[in-house]
Structure formats: structure tokens, C-alpha cells
Regions:
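N-terminal glycine-rich, Lys/His-bearing helix-loop that initiates the first secondary-structure elements
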Residues: 1-67, 429-435
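Short, flexible, solvent-exposed loop/turn segments with mixed acidic/basic and small polar residues
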Residues: 115-116, 140, 326-334, 390-395
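Conserved PLP-enzyme active-site core in the AAT-like
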Residues: 3-12, 23-30, 99-310, 315, ...
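PLP-dependent enzyme catalytic core of the Aspartate aminotransferase-like
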Residues: 2-4, 98, 139, 148, ...
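Conserved N-terminal alpha-helix of the aminotransferase class I/II PLP-enzyme fold
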Residues: 39, 44, 49-108, 133-140
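Pocket-edge structural micro-motifs
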Residues: 24-26, 41-45, 78, 345, ...
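Active-site C-terminal subdomain of aminotransferase-like
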Residues: 31, 48, 53-54, 59-72, ...
């Protein structure tokens, strides 16, 4: 029977992830020659014998060590499912991870991972801003479990981070949680500096884990494991799913860490369902094509926005001339600026709302990474649970608009953006006349 290694190599040469998304981890002979794996829509699996069932449960609950030639069998879809196992094998290829787990949502991946790796008395040092749901979980849910969250700005220097760690008076630093690029400001965090900090202050007995939400650029344009991360997280709803038709999440790490995360997933029941897993496998086949096309269009649109008279500022990863430190991180960590753009429209919330309400081709909706372009207002939508003073500290402004660029023709997107700007300009002109 061919192994995963056999699937991934030809003539001793490693195949690239985009070439393996159609076949890795699956053999058509398993399913009547079907070129695509079927959806294993089942809750439970039949054992060949009571002895086999006992052996599977011993491994599932860690009652004994797995034998050298022993495989974990199928028990129940809350533990494992063939649709999810094939998906998870394929997910590992993009980041070069040993193992992966799929989840019911991005927040399921984040919450399960953090609860698996943290305990009462621990401290999480986290970048700010992060996605609003992550921010709420860090600051409002984890404290209920005796876990403290301490934020830091992505522009903090290694010296400032070291001072912040030294200032932790109660609890033990157990994790550095990073979202980079940050949502919605596109600020970058130096993963290598965070990894060095974790090594400096952690021990073999009490390691400090570096956990990275890689949703904005991954898994094609940034690979955190190569820069010292221990765990990589995704909202698979976004670029991995890519069609705005599913909700899912993913975590990738070493086998020992994934064993802990998967155990927590089993008992929390946060796994992805087989149908969603199958849809994600479909999406992975076009992942690189979609992300590259969207990034090409985003670069054109970001440059156009920067020159627009009604735009005060753009937040895009090739517009970092004002901050050499951010440019340096971009050069070391990122393979592309991606397709997420934020910009400040001149004015405030009223102008931002007029602009958003005037869009026609670009849809007014939260989420990102789909084939269609989306626009939203972070201050009152995705990050509305963060107080206004905290938003200001994080760089989230009332006039900020976040764009997720899809695969439409960029000329048509700019046509839509321009008519929305004109709608704002016409209202402002009328207001001046009335004044």
C-alpha cells in the first residue's frame, strides 16, 4: 500500500503542495475508483472485534503507547473521520507541519488550542489588535479559567517585550499569542523575536509556546513554523475555504502538541463535520491560484487608493516606507502582501458609512478571503466589542474601512470604489452648499 511519503514524491523529488491537493492522503482504490474521496457522513464506525475496539480506545485515551506498526483506528466522528484525516494530511503540506486538526470554526480552533495548552495561573502575552472574537476570548473568557492576558503592540521592540515579560508580577508566562498581519491594521509582528523571547524565558519543564494566527497570509504567503512558531492557527472559513460557503478552523503543530490539542477537541466536541471537511478539500485545490490572483489585484487597488484625494491613509504591506522596522519584518516573513487592504477615508464614521452604503459590486459584509470582494467598518463591526479608547491605541479609527479583495477584475473593483467615493464627495459638496 502506498505511504504518504510515496504520494508526495516522484523520483525522489518532493512535490509542491499545490500539486498534491488533488490526491495526497487518498487512493481511489479505497472507494470504487472514485477520483475524489467520498464524504464519510457517519457518526460511528464498526469494529472487527471487541478486542479491536478495546485496542482503539486504549490509544484514543492514551492508556498505552502506540506500537511502531500500529495505526489509530476509526471509532467515532468526534474523535476521527476519514474525510477529516485526508483534509488534515493535506493541510500539513503548506506549512510543513507534522500534524493538523480541523475544527468547526476559527474560534473553535483558537479556543480549543488555548485551553489545551494553558492552565490556571498562566499568563498569555498577546499582540494587539487581534480579531475581535479572539480579543474577547483572551480578555473575557480566559480570566474565568484563571488565565491572564497581557497585550502588546506589534511595533514593540524586543527590548520592550523583554521589559513587559519582566513586569509580569503574578502567574507564569506560558504562551505568546500573535496575529500577524494584524486584523484590521495589517501591522506585522516579528515572529523570530517572539520565538527568541519564548526560548529565553521558557524551560524544558515550563516551555513558552508561540501560537500564531496566520489567517491573513497563510498558508501560501507566510509560514510561521519556519520562523519559530509552535502552533499555527487558521480561520479556514477565509482563504482556505475561499468561497464564503463554510465555517471551519485549523491548527497545525508538532505531533506531541497536536496530541494535546486533538484530545481537547475530542472532549470539547469542536471538530469539523465531514461535509465541511470535504468542501475544504475542494477549496484547497485552487487555494494558491485564488490567493495569487487576489493579491495581484489588491496591489493594484492599494496603490490606486493611496493616490486618491479622499483617502487619508492606506494600510497595506507594500506601503510600509514610513516604518523601516515593519518593512524588515515583511522582507523576512512574507512572500506577498496578500489581498487585505485597510484605508482611512477622509472624514469620520459618517463618510465611511456613506462610502460603504454606496458600494455595488463590492459587498458590505464581514469575513474575508472569499472569491468575492467584501468591505466592512472594523470599529463598529468586527472589532465593536473593543472600547473606543482601546481601538484608538490599536490604530483602529472611525474612518477605517477594511477591504478583502476577491478574484474580480481589478478595473471593475476600482470603478465601484470610485463611484462610492463620488457619492461621498457629492454629499459633502451639498453639505458645504447648505452651510
Amino acid at each position: 500500500m502506498p505511504t504518504l511519503h510515496d504520494h508526495a514524491h516522484i523520483g525522489g523529488q518532493q512535490l509542491r503542495p499545490e500539486s498534491l491537493m488533488m490526491s495526497y492522503g487518498y487512493t481511489p482504490a479505497w472507494s470504487e475508483g472514485a477520483i475524489k474521496p467520498p464524504i464519510f457522513q457517519t457518526s460511528t464506525f464498526v469494529f472487527d472485534s471487541a478486542e479491536q475496539g478495546k485496542a482503539y480506545f486504549e490509544l484514543a485515551y492514551g492508556l498505552r503507547q502506540q506500537g511502531p506498526d500500529e495505526e489509530m483506528g476509526l471509532i467515532y466522528s468526534r474523535l476521527n473521520n476519514p474525510s477529516l484525516e485526508i483534509l488534515e494530511h493535506r493541510l500539513t503540506l503548506w506549512d510543513g507541519a507534522e500534524d493538523a486538526a480541523s475544527f468547526a470554526s476559527g474560534m473553535a480552533a483558537i479556543s480549543t488550542t488555548l485551553l489545551a495548552l494553558l492552565k490556571p495561573g498562566d499568563v498569555v502575552l498577546h499582540s494587539e489588535p487581534v480579531y475581535g472574537g479572539s480579543d474577547f476570548f483572551l480578555k473575557n473568557v480566559l480570566p474565568k479559567f484563571g488565565i491572564t492576558a497581557v497585550g502588546f503592540r506589534p511595533t514593540a521592540t524586543p527590548e520592550e517585550l523583554t521589559a513587559q515579560v519582566a513586569g509580569i508580577e503574578q502567574g507564569r508566562l506560558a504562551m505568546i499569542f500573535v496575529e500577524t498581519p494584524a486584523n484590521p491594521t495589517n501591522h506585522l509582528v516579528d515572529l523570530e523575536a517572539c520565538a527568541a523571547l519564548a526560548r529565553q524565558h521558557g524551560t524544558s519543564e515550563h516551555p513558552i509556546r508561540l501560537v500564531v494566527d496566520n489567517t491573513f497570509l497563510g498558508p501560501v504567503f507566510q509560514h510561521p513554523l519556519k520562523h519559530g512558531a509552535d502552533v499555527v492557527l487558521y480561520s479556514a472559513t477565509k482563504f482556505l475555504g475561499g468561497h464564503s460557503d463554510l465555517i471551519a478552523g485549523a491548527a497545525l503543530a508538532s505531533k506531541p502538541l497536536m496530541k494535546e490539542i486533538k484530545a481537547m477537541r475530542t472532549f470539547m466536541g469542536t471538530m469539523c463535520d465531514p461535509n465541511t471537511g470535504w468542501m475544504l478539500m475542494r477549496s484547497l485545490e485552487t487555494l494558491k491560484l485564488r490567493m495569487e490572483r487576489a493579491a495581484q489585484s489588491a496591489q493594484i487597488i492599494a496603490d490606486w487608493l493611496r493616490a486618491h484625494p479622499l483617502v487619508q491613509r492606506t494600510y497595506y504591506l507594500t506601503h510600509l516606507e514610513h516604518c523601516p522596522a515593519q518593512q524588515d519584518i515583511y522582507r523576512r516573513h512574507c512572500l506577498s502582501p496578500g489581498s487585505m487592504i485597510s484605508f482611512d477615508i477622509k472624514g469620520g464614521e459618517p463618510e465611511a458609512f456613506r462610502f460603504l452604503n454606496a458600494l455595488r459590486l463590492i459587498k458590505l459584509a464581514v469575513s474575508l478571503g472569499g472569491t468575492e470582494s467584501l468591505a466592512e467598518h472594523p470599529a463598529t463591526m468586527t472589532h465593536s466589542d473593543i472600547s473606543v479608547p482601546e481601538q484608538a491605541e490599536m490604530g483602529i479609527t472611525a474612518q477605517m474601512i477594511r477591504l478583502s479583495i476577491g478574484v474580480e477584475d481589478p478595473r471593475d473593483l476600482m470603478l465601484d470604489l470610485e463611484q462610492a467615493f463620488e457619492a461621498v464627495g457629492m454629499v459633502k459638496a451639498r453639505e458645504l452648499e447648505l452651510a
